[in-house]
Structures are given as C-alpha cells and as structure tokens.
Amino acid sequence: MKRIFSLLLAGLLVFLLAACGAPAAPALPDAGPDGSSALKLDTLNVEFAIGERDADELMRLQAELPPLLLSALENENVTVETVSITFGASAEATAQALEDGSVDVAFLPSEAFVLSDPPLRLIAVENMSVPAGEYFPDIDFAALPDVAADSPIYENIVAGSDDTPVALGAAFSRALVMLCASADGNAVMQRYGSASYLISGHPGTLLTPLVTCLTLEVEE
C-alpha cells in the first residue's frame, strides 16, 4: 500500500552555538531597507542523511543547492559566505552531528527525531492524523518528553535547541519557502527526495505555516 507524503520545506534556521570551540554568534547589524535586521553568517552547515539514495544525485545536490540557497537567503537580507553540504552515513549519525553542533541543519526521517537522545525540540510539523503509538509501535513514548503515544504523528519535523535568536528563524523560513517555490530550487531538492528536516539552534516556536515542496510515495 502506498501513502503519499509531502516533504515540507519551511522554517529553515541555523546555528548551534556551543560553549567551547563554537563559531562566533551571527552579526546583527543595522536594519535593512525593508526594516528587517540584516544577518551575516560565515558558514551554514547542512547535512543530509544518505539512506539508499543515488550517489550521483546527491553529488549534484551538493553542487547545485549552495548557490540557490545563498540567493534565497540574500533576498531575505541574510548574507552567508559559505553553504557547506555534507552527507551522513546514517540518520543516527546525522542526528548526532546536529546535537554536537557540527551541523546547523539536518535533513532526517522523523524516526530520527523521535529516537534522538537527548531529545531534539519539536518546532513545527505536518499533522498526519495518526496516533504516534500506532505509527511507531516499538517506541517507549513514556520516556520521551515532547511526544506522547496519543499525539498526532508528524511525518515531517522541524526541531532544534534554544540557542539561536528567534529573529533568524523567520528569515530562513521565508528563504527556503522561496527556494522550494522556484522551478530550479524544487528540481534540486527533488534530487534528495524523501526526508524530514531538523534545525539546530532554534527556540521551540512555530515560525510560519509549513509549505509543501515535494510529494513522495512511500511503500508500506
């Protein structure tokens, strides 16, 4: 049986500011011409969990996504010097990199969010109207602080920590929405296909309505 899921690409945000060896906080200079605060970042580290995806498509994604993302961010008054795209050998490895702060944004399946220890913070999701306990029957939800067995299950998740200013969230959210709305951006993200995404360094706040970027078929 096939179920159609949407890959939600909205609410993109960066930065896990660790105490030791972390990069400096992003500069927050004077307001831009539209009244929004200009943001400057040296590097945005984005990691995709490889799974069973085609290696050639991932290499194309690695080459094609950075300039599109840079342009989308620039339109939101955000200047990023470098977008670094890496690939994790597994969802668990990518989730760990997110927790450790070596990755700012991670594209992951929802299982990686639910099983993350320490737990990642839930920010925004798509409601699939299925109780979490039915969707993940082998998970002990009593041990999870943010998800209950009777909660609606969320196939696509945005999560993060508490360390980044809220002001960054809206800018990256709009940038990724714009990227996914463009033909070029959508085509590039199609190279990855199925994934949820997690965001490091963001307080638990719903930033904008989630936006459908891709439609997937998942075998059951």
Locate predicted features.
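N-terminal low-complexity, Pro/Thr/Ser-rich intrinsically disordered segments
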Residues: A25-A49, R53, D138-P145
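C-terminal motif of bacterial Sec signal peptides marking the signal peptidase cleavage site
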Residues: L16-A19
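Extracytoplasmic small-molecule ligand-binding "clamshell" domains
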Residues: S37-V114
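Acidic, polar ligand-binding/catalytic clefts
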Residues: G88, E92-V147
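Ser/Thr- (and often Asn-) enriched beta-sheet segments in non-cytosolic proteins
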Residues: K40-N45, T79-T86, R121-A124, D140, ...
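Bacterial signal peptide processing site
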Residues: G21-P23
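Extended ligand-binding regions for polar small-molecule ligands
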Residues: P33, A63-L73, D138, A142-E220
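Positively charged n-region of N-terminal signal peptides that target proteins for export
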Residues: M1-I4, G11
